[in-house]
């Protein structure tokens, strides 16, 4: 065969860890030396970060529908670079989905949600002049956050699903993931909020590369 497809995934994906980057680069280099005309790699490893934005731009172009959504939400947030973002990746912690990882008991969920909301309150104290775009994979968390009616918090509408566990959904639902990525990319700083039981998602980091946003992590 002229084509070699491979999937290389890792749960160790800390952008600040030099040795993780070094080992990932060595593994990918070994695969890319295989004697095939085309090598198709699906991976969440760190690679070609400097070229990521330009390569992404070559492969993907937003449709008019997506561009209209981006323009609308940018206007609500004051324009590109005039807001920050905070991303939470709960998986099934709050009982929204069946995806893997632990699930908190019902009596543990609200205190945990409060802990996460407090991280947003503290972030606002540090940068009171900026709105905060909040994205998450839990409608329970987002609904609770919206009930607070915090004037500086912006949550985009749309059904929250886990793409890898969702089949035959509407176009609108799949569009939400693309919209989230582009909206994160236009923030001045992209924050991933995490602790030792949340999933250490690479999604916000990759989004930050698209338009040169600063990336940082907030530990609960």
Predicted regions, residues:
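Catalytic donor nucleotide-activated moiety binding site of glycosyltransferases and closely related
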Residues: 87-95, 118-170
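Donor nucleotide-activated moiety binding/catalytic core segment of transferases
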Residues: 110, 155-193
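Marks the mature luminal ectodomains of secretory-pathway proteins
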Residues: 115-116, 130, 155-156, 202, ...
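Short amphipathic alpha-helical segments
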Residues: 99, 145-147, 204-205
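Structural motif
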Residues: 83-84, 131, 189
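Secretory-pathway glycan-assembly enzymes, especially type II membrane glycosyltransferases
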Residues: 1-110, 114-117
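A donor-sugar binding/catalytic signature common to diverse glycosyltransferases
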Residues: 175-220
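N-terminal cationic-hydrophobic initiation segments that often serve targeting/anchoring roles
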Residues: 78, 121-125, 146, 184, ...
